[in-house]
Swiss-Prot record:
GO terms for biological process: attachment of mitotic spindle microtubules to kinetochore; mitotic spindle organization. It holds the Pfam family RMD1-3. Coiled coil: none annotated. This is Regulator of microtubule dynamics protein 1. It comes from Homo sapiens (Human). Belongs to the RMDN family. One of its GO terms (molecular function) is microtubule binding. Its main location: cytoplasm. The modification N6-succinyllysine is found at residue 165. The gene is RMDN1. Keywords: Cytoplasm, Cytoskeleton, Microtubule, Repeat, TPR repeat. InterPro entries: RMD1-3_a_helical_rpt, TPR-like_helical_dom_sf.
Length: 314
């Protein structure tokens, strides 16, 4: 109300007006009264109370708008704080390996417009799909659900490296249900998003690792898939084990021992390049990696089997 009081004091027709503020006497009729009176082309209303009330209402309306703005800004701050709190909870559950609890938390906010929340939901959906106890029917639904969340995250923020990364991952997963032709057709799109993720965040070891997987996959592509690729593209996607190895090593340099699968793939790539000594080194690291997730356990098993396999051949 302070603003209203100030406006009231500035009104020209208030009681106790300063000397000289009244209109000159005798401009229209006797005794110095104005009928309404005309003064140099302006008509001044003869009821000052009406004018006061109108101006006061305008002041109050302005104050109401200012209050609305303050409340709106406070709501935005509160909503932002709430999202930050949810993200902290989500990251804690992810680091703790609480896959299903994380999914349950984030699905409550599946209608969110926040890219950071949406890509985490895409990741959580995919992680639940990969659990051994998830049925094939549920897995398929979760894979497509994950792609939708990742797509929305990317639409909300194209500058989010994680949104590019998870969109590419989820698009690749969907290819498992749509056939080899669709998977190859999406190959360049997937590669572009991995490259964009690396460009936006060169220190993200996971994006670099995934680019290595892309190279490894196309390096070992069987002949019949290469034929399909030639039908789809004038220049079909291709790569080499050397390129894959470069990405896996680069990921390891950025964040040593960040992921058991990177260690496994370093070993497998060296096997493809017939370097058994270095293959054994990396496979041993994969086998001894502390198992925090179900995937880690699967990788430990595969690494142990590969070590046994080529040790027996020697």
């Amino acid at each position: 109300m302070a603003l209203a009081a100030r406006l009231w004091r500035l009104l020209p027709f208030r009681r106790g007006a300063a000397p000289g503020s009244r209109l000159p006497a005798g401009t229209s009729g006797s005794r110095g009264h104005c009928g309404p009176c005309r003064f140099r082309g302006f008509e001044v209303m003869g009821n000052p109370g009406t004018f006061k009330r109108g101006l006061l209402l305008s002041a109050l309306s302005y104050l109401g708008f200012e209050t609305y703005q303050v409340i709106s800004q406070a709501a935005v701050v509160h909503a932002t704080a709430k999202v930050e709190e949810i993200l902290e909870q989500a990251d804690y559950l992810y680091e703790s390996g609480e896959t299903e609890k994380l999914y349950q938390l984030l699905t409550q906010y599946k209608e969110s417009e926040d890219a950071e929340l949406l890509w985490r939901l895409a990741r959580a959906s995919r992680d639940v799909a990969q659990l051994s106890r998830t049925s094939e029917e549920e897995k398929k639904l979760l894979v497509y659900e994950a792609l939708e969340y990742a797509k929305r995250a990317l639409e909300k923020n194209e500058s989010s490296f994680a949104s590019h990364k998870w969109y590419a991952i989820c698009l690749s997963d969907v290819g498992d249900y749509e056939g080899i032709k669709a998977k190859i057709a999406n190959a360049y799109i997937i590669k572009e998003h991995f490259e964009k993720a690396i460009e936006l965040n060169p220190k993200d070891a996971t994006s670099i690792h995934l680019m290595g997987i892309w190279c490894y996959t196309f390096a070992e592509m069987p002949w019949y898939q290469r034929r399909i690729a030639k039908m789809l593209f004038a220049t079909p996607p291709s790569s080499t084990y050397e390129k894959a190895l470069g990405y896996f090593h680069r990921a390891e340099q950025v964040d040593p021992n960040f992921y058991s699968k990177n260690l496994l793939l370093l070993g497998k790539t060296y096997l493809k390049l017939h370097n058994k000594k270095l293959a054994a080194f990396w496979l041993m690291k994969a086998k001894d990696y502390p198992a925090h997730t179900e995937e880690d356990k699967q990788i430990q098993t595969e690494a142990a089997q590969l070590l046994t396999s080529f040790s027996e051949k020697n």
